[in-house]
Amino acid sequence: IGDCVMDFRKYSLKELVNNVKTKKVSAKEMTEAAINNISKYDKTLNAFCAVNFDDALKQAEHVDSLINKGEDPGMLAGLPIGVKDLEDAKGFVTSYGSELHINDEPAQEDSILVKRMKNQGCIVLGKTNTPEFGYKGKTDNVPFGTTKNPWNLDYSPGGSSGGTAAAIASGMIPMGTASDGGGSIRIPAALSGLAGIKTSQGRIPIESNKPPGSGVLTVKGLLANSTEDNAMALDEIGR
C-alpha cells in the first residue's frame, strides 16, 4: 500500500467515479487511499469495528480489470464504502454491536443492499460501528466502544448509523450504508454535517429474516457528503 491519503470530502461521487472510469486514478489507488485514511484516523474515531483490506484490494483490482477490458464496472465504480454492522457483508460477522453476536459465524452472502452496491462497483472495506441493535441515537457499545465525532472528539456523531457517519465526515470514505427507524440516518447526518434521507418503505428491500432494527418502521439507506451524492447512489441501488 502506498502512502497517499485522499480527503474524500473534497470530491463528489460523480467526480470520483469519473476519475476511475477515465483512468485518472485506479480503483485500487482509491482503495489504498481509503485504507491509509482508516489506518491514520480510525484509532481516534473508532468508526470501523471490522475491516478486511486484502479483500477490498481484490475487489478494486476486479473493477480495474473490467475497465481495462472495456466492460461496464458499474455506476459507482471504485467507491470505497463502509457497511453498517446491522447489515450482512460476506465474510464479516454481523454483530449488531452486541456481545450476543460477536462470535457468530461470518455472513455467507451479502445483504440485498450490499450486493447492489457491489454490483455497481463499490468496494467494501469493512463494518461500521453501531449501538447495540441500533436502538439509540449515540454510537457506543460494549464490544467495540464509543465512536467519536470528527468535528469535535468530545461529541457523538449520533446514531445509530454513527460509525458510517464518522467515517464519511472525517473524509476516510465517501459513502456508506445506513438504516433508519426513528432517526438513525437523520440524526447522524445532522450531527456530522452529512446528507441523509429516510427512504420510502421498500425502496431498498429488507430480507425478512434480517430486520435492521425497529421492524416495519425501519428502512435501509445511505449516508454521503451531499444531497447530490445521496441521490446519485440511491438512483442506482434503489431501483
Regions found by a protein language model. Name each.
Residues 1-58:
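An N-terminal boundary/leader segment
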Residues 16-22, 82, 101-105, 218-225:
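Short, well-ordered beta-strand elements within core beta-sheets of diverse protein domains
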Residues 16-20, 63, 164:
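Generic hydrophobic alpha-helical segments
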Residues 25-26, 72, 173:
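Conserved hydrophobic residue
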Residues 34, 56, 78, 84, ...:
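Conserved hydrophobic/aromatic pocket- or pore-lining residues that grip, position, or stack substrates
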Residues 63-80, 229:
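Immediate post-signal peptide segment of exported/extracytoplasmic ligand-binding proteins
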Residues 75-113:
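Enzymes and membrane/adaptor proteins characterized by extended Gly/Ser/Thr/Asp/Glu-rich
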Residues 109-234:
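Short glycine/serine-rich loop segments
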